[in-house]
Amino acid sequence: MSDTSATKTEIRVIIVGGSVAGLTLAHCLAKANISHVVLEKRAEISPQEGAFLGIWPNGGRIFDQLGVYADLEQCTVPIHTMRVRFPDGFSFSSELPRCVQERFGYPIVSLDRQKVLEILHDRYPAKSNIHINKRVTEIRQTEREAQVVTDDGAVYKGDLVVGADGIHSAVRAEMWRQAKGLVGRRDGQAFAVEYACVFGISTPIPGLESGEHVNSYSDGLCVITFHGKDGRIFWFILIKLHKRFVYPKTPRFSASDAAKVCAEYASVPVWGEICVRDLWRNKTSASMTALEEGLLKTWNFKRVVLLGDSIHKMTPNIGQGANTAAEDAAVLASLLQRLSTSASSTTSGTIDAVLREYVSLRYKRVKSTYQRAYFGARLHTRDNVLKCFVGRYIFPRFSQQVLERTSQAIAGAPLVDFLPTPKRSGAGWSDYAGSPEVGAPTVPWLVISLPVLASVLCYLMFA
């Protein structure tokens, strides 16, 4: 662990966005004694929007380093069993979540996004650094500093501006404006929408047991539930849209749209005799949103850098959005802490070098996570004949291989490198260390599929 009291270089960081990404970075910087402010455009840090998020071991270990994991853990129960249902009535169960916890020391959990933000805010040691009602209108950059201008006329000065302001990022828009000609057409059209999602939270439903997780797959649709503390049900319904939209020309949805979707699919089975109508009937909150997907190539320009959903946006199917944002924050903070304890200056060249290293350390892993989420959404909604086959006949028969690939993906996660590794970390971190990044299933998986396909065809032909 580095001695943060030996700071030689004063760094000032302006974080735009009081999101999970932004507040996690703020916690990291506070631990490193690096000066920073958080600018949030909304009037409150933790509004109730009906959304929830999953915390996997790769995110949980970082939150544990920051001293907030115990509070998060008290709000939920570990997921120990996964249940999967297909439209033909076939179903199977897996202990993958329990095995993941045994290997890595942290469970898979789900809880309200509002509660996560509330805990991150409540446990943050310098609340005077957080400013609400601060909508960014302009970013200025010079050789000596960056300036962020907000709609109330305030000007914030720093060495670095971090865009943690989500998919509709004002920081990204300013970066693109200033880097015109350097940001390619690909990045300008990187985010697209093929799916919409209804998120909801419901009161307990008999038959959906705490600690279990259900995946119900249909053609063009999937229903996924997580059953938390006191039986609360966190759920989402992923729907394939009739066309592909390119951001920012994407659809918007209202509460009435969510109601219409749940009415249309009311009879879709979830598990046993439970259907979508039961989730909707017991809801305490629900909302509907378009799901942007995309990964940018350009993450930084001079003194501006992006993290979280502002650069990589994925569907919720593999539950890695918040975890990947926490990883971003851990890596960026670790590099800034290293700079703060060096004798280097904070010229544009020095800052640019740090940001380039951040991108170099993160891009490959983020890309693999994005690919897995992209594949997962299409597998779960049975997007084509191959994915129908792989989901129905391959994954149920290769559960151990799925666990191994999941373990490899988790083990590659970074830490806040100037903070101690939590004692509860399991042996899986070292057992699977050095594994190659795990993306979507590719040729080897398809080769494995061939003998199974042959046996299925023989059964259909001669049974």
UniProtKB/Swiss-Prot annotation:
EC numbers, comma separated: 1.-.-.-
The entry's keywords: FAD, Flavoprotein, Membrane, Monooxygenase, Oxidoreductase, Transmembrane, Transmembrane helix
Pfam families: FAD_binding_3
Compartments, record wording: Membrane
Known pathway: Secondary metabolite biosynthesis; terpenoid biosynthesis
GO cellular-component term (any): membrane
Sequence similarity: Belongs to the paxM FAD-dependent monooxygenase family.
Record-given protein name: FAD-dependent monooxygenase ausM
Gene: ausM
